[in-house]
C-alpha cells in the first residue's frame, strides 16, 4: 500500500461538478492499493497516518499528529501510484490491485481511521476527480507499507 501524504491548509474533492469532500487544515492522502496488500497493510497505514508527527507544536517543531491536533484528512483512491514508467512511454499498472478488492481495502482504511476518532473525507472510488489543495510548508511524504507489494532490496 502506497500513500502520498500532503500537509494542507485546505483541500477539496469535486466529482462531476459536485464537491464531495472538503477540509480545513489537515492531510490530503492519495492512497494506492497494490497486488498482495492485505488487512495488515491497512492496519500499518492507518497507524502511520493517525500518529505521524508532521504538524508543528508551539515551538515550531513537527511534533504533533492528526490524533493530537484533531485536524481532518481526505483520503483519495489513486491506483496510479502503482504506475511503472521505467520502460516505454506509457506507464504500466500491473502492480495495482484489481478494483473490487482495492475498493474494499480503501474503504476499510477510511473506516479504521474514523474508528480512531478522525474526521475523514473521501473521494469517490474510480471516479474522475478534481482534487484541489493548498499545501502547508510544503510538507509531502511518501509512505509504503512493508507488505509484499513493497519493492525488494
Swiss-Prot record:
It is found in: Cytoplasm. GO terms for molecular function: D-tyrosyl-tRNA(Tyr) deacylase activity; Gly-tRNA(Ala) deacylase activity; Ser(Gly)-tRNA(Ala) hydrolase activity; tRNA binding. It catalyses: glycyl-tRNA(Ala) + H2O = tRNA(Ala) + glycine + H(+); a D-aminoacyl-tRNA + H2O = a tRNA + a D-alpha-amino acid + H(+). Keywords: Cytoplasm, Hydrolase, RNA-binding, tRNA-binding. The keyword Hydrolase applies. SUPFAM superfamilies: DTD-like. GO terms for biological process: D-amino acid catabolic process. Its EC number is 3.1.1.96. GO terms for cellular component: cytoplasm. InterPro entries: Daa-tRNA_deacyls_DTD, DTD-like_sf. It comes from the Bacteria. A motif (Gly-cisPro motif, important for rejection of L-amino acids) lies at residues 137-138. An aminoacyl-tRNA editing enzyme that deacylates mischarged D-aminoacyl-tRNAs. Also deacylates mischarged glycyl-tRNA(Ala), protecting cells against glycine mischarging by AlaRS. Acts via tRNA-based rather than protein-based catalysis; rejects L-amino acids rather than detecting D-amino acids in the active site. By recycling D-aminoacyl-tRNA to D-amino acids and free tRNA molecules, this enzyme counteracts the toxicity associated with the formation of D-aminoacyl-tRNA entities in vivo and helps enforce protein L-homochirality. Homodimer. A Gly-cisPro motif from one monomer fits into the active site of the other monomer to allow specific chiral rejection of L-amino acids. Belongs to the DTD family. NCBIfam families: D-aminoacyl-tRNA deacylase. This is D-aminoacyl-tRNA deacylase. It comes from Myxococcus xanthus (strain DK1622).
Amino acid at each position: 500500500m502506497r500513500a502520498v501524504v500532503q500537509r494542507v491548509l485546505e483541500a477539496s474533492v469535486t466529482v462531476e461538478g459536485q464537491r464531495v469532500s472538503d477540509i480545513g487544515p489537515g492531510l490530503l492522502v492519495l492512497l494506492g492499493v497494490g497486488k498482495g496488500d492485505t488487512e495488515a497493510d491497512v492496519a500499518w497505514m492507518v497507524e502511520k497516518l493517525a500518529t505521524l508527527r508532521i504538524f508543528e507544536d508551539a515551538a515550531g517543531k513537527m511534533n504533533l499528529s492528526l490524533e493530537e491536533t484533531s485536524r481532518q484528512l481526505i483520503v483519495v483512491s489513486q491506483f496510479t501510484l502503482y504506475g511503472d514508467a521505467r520502460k516505454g512511454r506509457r506507464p504500466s499498472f500491473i502492480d495495482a490491485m484489481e478494483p473490487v478488492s482495492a475498493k474494499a481495502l480503501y474503504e476499510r482504511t477510511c473506516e479504521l481511521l474514523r474508528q480512531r476518532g478522525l474526521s475523514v473525507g473521501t473521494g469517490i472510488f474510480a471516479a474522475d476527480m478534481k482534487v484541489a489543495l493548498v499545501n502547508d510548508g510544503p510538507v509531502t511524504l511518501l509512505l509504503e507499507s512493508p507488505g509484499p507489494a513493497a519493492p525488494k532490496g
